[in-house]
């Protein structure tokens, strides 16, 4: 069963190109270790909420943009094995491919796909 890792982050708007380059480099590593696809989306219409919202969830500050991303894997097992390899891959190290955003406010989780229409 297809498995999805989902991510939401706040990225300094001025770092859009740095983020795109970071994500492209990361995508190569993830795909080499079993990911089927990696998608990165730059916030365009992401409203503030009163109780909950993407900006609130990642404590988005002025001058930051919400990014929504996901990685598709063939299965949970493939994801677990692949993620271990990604984390051990030297190309994933912060000194090689630094994150151009505050990783402490990154939200992520793994999800079983139940509808793919």
State the predicted function of each range.
Residues 1-21, 25:
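Long, hydrophobic N-terminal alpha-helical segment
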Residues 4-11, 49-86:
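Short, well-ordered beta-strand segments in beta-rich or mixed alpha/beta enzyme
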Residues 20-26, 82-90:
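Short amphipathic alpha-helices in soluble, non-transmembrane regions
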Residues 33-42, 73-75, 81-82:
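Conserved long hydrophobic alpha-helices within structured protein cores
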């Amino acid at each position: 069963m297809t498995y999805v890792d989902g991510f939401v982050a706040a990225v300094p708007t001025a770092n859009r190109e740095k983020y795109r380059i970071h994500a492209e480099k990361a995508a190569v590593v993830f795909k080499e270790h079993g990911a089927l696809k990696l998608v990165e989306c730059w916030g365009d219409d992401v409203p503030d909420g009163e109780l909950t919202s993407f900006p609130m969830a990642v404590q988005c500050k002025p001058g930051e943009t919400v990014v929504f991303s996901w990685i598709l894997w063939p299965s949970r097992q493939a994801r677990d094995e692949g993620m271990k390899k990604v984390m051990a891959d030297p190309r994933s190290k912060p000194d090689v491919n630094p994150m151009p955003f505050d990783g402490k406010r990154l939200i992520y989780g793994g999800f079983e796909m139940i509808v793919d229409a």
